[in-house]
């Protein structure tokens, strides 16, 4: 398998899941390389409730968000890899490459208990600033 350098400049896809109401969640996926985002609303059974559109984001905002992740030291946090227990329940996944030979993304997940809830709240807020819209609920960070 081809090796990809795990550095901030290679960060591409950021997937953030925020809880919403009545067991629903909202997932925001942002591409820092292709400069777009999409939002999907997920019901209690895990089914996507809306059409997915790739919405462009400003290059300058994507660069600013990448710097924010660097300041937060994202790559120093404990992570899970695909196949690890809890990977699919993690609220934050980041990708830093795509292996065309293996046809898979090179990504890691930040488990819910790996960082303080205030840090997750801050990432949520910065993502809202990046995409220019609100999503999910902050109340779940206080529980």
What are these regions (language model features)?
Residues 1-20, 81-143:
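Short, well-ordered, aromatic-rich surface patches in folded extracellular/luminal domains
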Residues 1-8, 12, 48-64:
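Negatively charged, low-complexity tracts enriched in Asp/Glu with abundant Ser/Thr
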Residues 22-32:
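Amphipathic, interaction-prone secondary-structure segments
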Residues 28-30, 55-57, 94-96:
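Short, exposed beta-strand/loop patches in secreted or surface proteins that constitute
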Residues 30-36, 98-100:
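Short, solvent-exposed coil/turn segments at beta-strand boundaries
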Residues 35-43:
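N-terminal glycine/threonine-rich, aromatic-flanked beta-hairpin/loop signature
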Residues 45-47, 101-102:
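Short, cysteine-centered beta-strand-loop-beta hairpins and adjacent loop/turn segments enriched
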Residues 56-93:
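Short, internal acidic amphipathic alpha-helical interface segments
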């Amino acid at each position: 398998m081809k090796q990809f350098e795990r550095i901030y400049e290679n960060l591409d896809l950021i997937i953030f899941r925020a809880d919403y109401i009545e067991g629903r969640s909202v997932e925001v996926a942002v591409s820092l390389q292709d400069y777009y985002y999409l939002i999907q609303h997920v019901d209690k059974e895990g089914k996507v409730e809306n059409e997915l559109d790739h919405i462009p984001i400003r290059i300058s905002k994507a660069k600013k968000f990448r710097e924010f992740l660097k300041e937060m030291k994202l790559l120093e946090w404990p992570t899970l890899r695909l196949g690890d227990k809890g990977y699919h329940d993690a609220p934050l996944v980041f990708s830093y490459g795509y292996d065309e030979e293996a046809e898979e993304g090179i990504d890691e997940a930040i488990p819910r208990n790996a960082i303080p809830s205030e840090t997750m709240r801050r990432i949520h807020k910065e993502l809202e600033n990046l995409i220019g819209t609100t999503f999910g609920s902050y109340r779940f960070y206080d529980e």
